[in-house]
Amino acid sequence: MPTIENEPKLDFKDVLLRPKRSTLKSRADVDLVREFVFRNSKKKYVGIPIVASNMDTVGTFEVAESLSKKRLFTTIHKHYSVDQWMEFVNRISSNQDILSQIGISSGISDYDFTKLKKICGLIPELQYICLDVANGYSEVFVDFIRRVREEFPRHTIFAGNVVTGEMTEELILSGADVVKVGIGSGSVCTTRKKAGVGYPQLSAVLECADASHGLNGHVMSDGGCTNPGDVAKALGAGADFVMIGGLFAGHDQCGGDTVEKDGQKYKLFYGMSSDTAMEKHEGSVAEYRASEGKTITVPYRGDISKTVQDLLGGLRSACTYTGAKKLKELSKRATFVRVTQQTNEQYATFEISPSELQNLNIAV
């Protein structure tokens, strides 16, 4: 019979990190680099564990080139052809280190598996695979993880998405190294409206991280971050990686058409289960499906490097406030307080961007 879980589940908006005594003298003293050895692949990762989402408007080769300069990771979207992959590898031939900070994404069809084998065979330096479905609870998905693990025993596998501890354990035991956590939390996802299914992201990360770490596995919080503070909360809750879509949208390096409205530039950004994505990549929305994503216009934001600086600065600040000398220590130092209000919004409607400020005529 139907049941109700009465324990409250929390999202990033429901909490703040409590400040704690700190010996740090400057944000510059914080070490954001993490090192992991993965459970199944046995491979070592070194970098800053912020990951660009494998959406076709975010997980682009151009984004990967920019983020790798700061040791951030990119999961390349699955719609690039084999030829496009080879063109990219040839273009970065003088800087092959980029390949250590990117992963190839794949669906779970036989076609996807064949394409994955071909690309990984042509590019042996590519060591990360992201297996991505909206619903990570299906037996078909678990079987596909086992199939990929058998074919690629030394590759590191990201797999998801799920939101509960028992399924996190299932995916890890089936061959995944990093489980992606999040259903319905993305900025352009409408699964919670269309299907009524989901889980508040902070609680999902807390529970899945606990399950994963008990097996020496790892988790990646995917979705729900609206600002750098949310990224810090996800890491404080136990996420080893944080995947970002909306915060990285709208930049020069991103996909999505550029449009103009009222003299202002915007870029299209859409969910990968939206009408826009399905019509672009599959020709139409299948008659048995409903769109579970939306299409929006994001104000044009220029080069992605400024957003990266803002994210990393926010993380360093979170660490100094909580007394974490290294990002590794943040989850050990984190105490969350439940709140009814995040920020003072008195002048929110009057806020202007740096570019708007430059265009103002200052009265003398």
UniProtKB/Swiss-Prot annotation:
PANTHER family attached to this UniProt entry: GMP REDUCTASE
Keyword Zinc carried by entry: no
A Gene Ontology BP annotation from the UniProt entry: purine nucleobase metabolic process
Function of the protein: Catalyzes the irreversible NADPH-dependent deamination of GMP to IMP. It functions in the conversion of nucleobase, nucleoside and nucleotide derivatives of G to A nucleotides, and in maintaining the intracellular balance of A and G nucleotides.
Membrane-spanning intervals of the chain: none
Residues annotated as the enzyme's active site: C189 (thioimidate intermediate), T191 (proton donor/acceptor)
Gene Ontology CC: GMP reductase complex
Complex and partners: Homotetramer.
Taxonomy, superkingdom: Eukaryota
GO molecular function: GMP reductase activity; metal ion binding
UniProt binding sites for K(+): G184, G186, C189, R192
Residues noted as binding GMP in the record, renumbered to the chain: D222, G223, G224, G245, G246, G271, M272, S273, R289, A290, S291, E292, G293
Major enzyme class: oxidoreductase
Record PROSITE patterns: IMP_DH_GMP_RED (PS00487)
Family of the protein in this entry: Belongs to the IMPDH/GMPR family. GuaC type 1 subfamily.
Name of the protein in its database record: GMP reductase
Reactions this protein catalyses: IMP + NH4(+) + NADP(+) = GMP + NADPH + 2 H(+)
Amino-acid positions noted as binding NADP(+) in the UniProt annotation, renumbered to this chain: 26-27, 78, 132-134, 183-184, 272, 288-289, 317-320
Source species of the chain: Onchocerca volvulus
Entries under HAMAP family matching the protein: GMP_reduct_type1
InterPro entries: Aldolase_TIM, GMP_reductase, GMPR, IMP_DH/GMP_Rdtase_CS, IMP_DH_GMPRt
CDD domains the UniProt entry points to: IMPDH (cd00381)
Keyword vocabulary terms for this entry: Metal-binding, NADP, Oxidoreductase, Potassium, Purine metabolism
EC number per UniProt: 1.7.1.7
